[in-house]
Amino acid sequence: MITLLIIMLLMSLFNMSKTPEAKGPVTYLQYSRSEMRYRVEYVFKRAENGDCTLTKIEGYQDETGQTIVVPASVADKLWEMVEEHKMRKYKSSYTPKMRVLDGYMWKLQAEFAKGERLYTGGDNEMPDGGIGIKQLVNYLAWLWDKQNVPPIREMVYRVDGMVAYPLHYYKLEKDYSNDCYIFTNASNCRYDEARSAQVPNAFADEIRQIVKEESMFDYAPDYQPEYEVLDGRSWRINLRFEGTKSTISSSGREAYPAGEGLRRIEQLCYEKWKELEPQSKPAPLQSPYE
């Protein structure tokens, strides 16, 4: 009995002497990547009162960057990714066997609620093929793009019904040579009967504003109705942006995302096309069903 008590006492002392395991949320996180002609850095901070900010520094001339306010839940989301990919076990340095002169360098450091810190970096090589770090960086970029909405590179909005042609089809694509956009309409006609016209950049900026106001970066990939509707409509929207991998890709049948984002874009495109139609030109499209 005495022996058992001694063992239990020793185990208790051993557990008390162990370093407390780090717990979320993340209170500070900095990621940077440098290449020959490009540099990007994200800095996340969580204040003692729980307020969170994200700063993006881009290019070699930018020293202070821009800062936005982000939800407090971001701190927990970052912690989840750190734990999921076991980032606290990353080595302090990763360097490939062969030197790459025109490659890249990266650095990641973070602090957690109980004071533990993470520091890691590398030269043209990342742990686990970079899966964890890329997921984390893509999330930070998505947060940034959600609030700032980069210039649109391409948009396709389509609504289909029970007929052989689209009820609505609007495509907006950047024309770099003329510093404008090509606006294509194939609504209520066959795809090979589509027409297009040039529109100024300001039109794309109006769509960007709708994307921001309606929080369209939060759109889920798929929306399905609670009950099947045999003669219902289906819709799809795809948006790509300049200088980022962030995209918006969403579709549904009858059910729509919260808000008025899709309807506002549809109405804006409809009104704009009424102005452009007299000057439009044939622009046959390939049917997505062929």
Q: What are these model-derived regions, one by one?
A:
Residues 41-63, 168-192:
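Short, flexible N-terminal segments of the mature chain
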Residues 16-36, 66-68, 81, 88-164, ...:
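Short, well-ordered, aromatic-rich surface patches in folded extracellular/luminal domains
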Residues 54-90, 184-219:
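A short-motif feature that recognizes glycine-rich, charge-decorated loops
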Residues 2-24:
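Bacterial Sec-dependent signal peptides at the C-terminal "C-region" and cleavage site
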Residues 5, 35-39:
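Charged, low-complexity intrinsically disordered regulatory segments in eukaryotic signaling
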